[in-house]
Amino acid sequence: MKKTIKYSILGLAALCTVLLCGGDYMLGYSLKPDDLVSRSRNIAASYDFMYERYPELHPWVDSLMTAGVLKDFYIENDRGETLHALYVAAAHPTLKTAVIVHGYTDNAVRMLMIGYLYNKEMDFNILLPDLYGHGMSEGNHAQMGWKDRLDVLQWTETADELFGRRHTDSVASRSTEMVVHGISMGAATTMMVSGEVEHGQYQQPFIKCFVEDCGYTSVWDEFRGELKAQFNLPAFPLLHTANWLCRQEYGWDFLEASALEQVKKCTLPMLFIHGDADTFVPTWMVYPLYEAKPEPKELWIVPGATHAMSYKDYPQEYTEHVKKFVGKYIH
């Protein structure tokens, strides 16, 4: 009997150890991928990649750099972390402003095609943050949009000060009119932001609308899907263990990091974009997001587009959809 109890305890301890090790591996694999260093931190390679994929960016960026108008900006967030962004004022003085949010293991440079859309095509001021742990911002892990939502809210205030309130001339002495536009994890971040801007301490009356492109419903749903797709494993027990470890180590969990719950609180306009061939953030996710979001809202399902490729595959149509939607709310 004593041996049975002893072996049972040892077996349980071994099982717990395996679960904790497996959960810790999954957490590191998800929030500290190698690409955070090799891809997101490599700014020179990011410019080269963007110039090859979007050749129209090269002369535009060169002209901005020559004129000295593609600028760096740094802030310190409420947690004392130093964050970086790129920003460019419009060619003509305006209050129209876009804050553009990148995806998982990307950086501000890798969102310059959307910067081009707003700054070159629409004559908007633009600000492109490096999220925590990405690009030139401080940090060693991805926050999957949840804590990033608070940083992006701070960046919207910074953009409003850069392009609006801090100026004394008649054009820019008022608050800006702002759109927040994100892709992939940046789209999830955008939706998480959307649930805050009309409520409590985070109210941002200068934000007029949102564009989300291929964002996920929640971190839990995204990780559950990837656990199945990459490792053919069910959510239980590994995802539950990683979720608990995330709460202990980082102070948030995969379930609370829900874009779906956030959009339910948002009554500002939102454009939903998703490729119908997306398997990384599967297309099905956009439908409950769209249904949960109160009006006004619009949905564009992009034929044949894989993950985060809607602009690349349909640049003219993408530009026209964004122009038409944003133009209804920012004049």
Where are these regions (language model features)?
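Catalytic histidine neighborhood in serine/cysteine hydrolases
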Residues: E291-A308
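Hydrolase active-site cap/lid region
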Residues: M192-W252
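Catalytic active-site module of serine/aspartate enzymes centered on a nucleophile-bearing elbow/loop
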Residues: D313-H331
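An N-terminal hydrophobic leader/cap segment in hydrolases
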Residues: T4-I9, A14-Y74
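Conserved acidic catalytic loop of the alpha/beta-hydrolase fold
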Residues: L150-T176
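Short beta-strand/loop motif that positions the catalytic acidic residue
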Residues: K265-T267, F272-H274, D278
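Short alpha-helix in the alpha/beta-hydrolase fold that links the catalytic acid
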Residues: I114, A259, L268, P282-E291
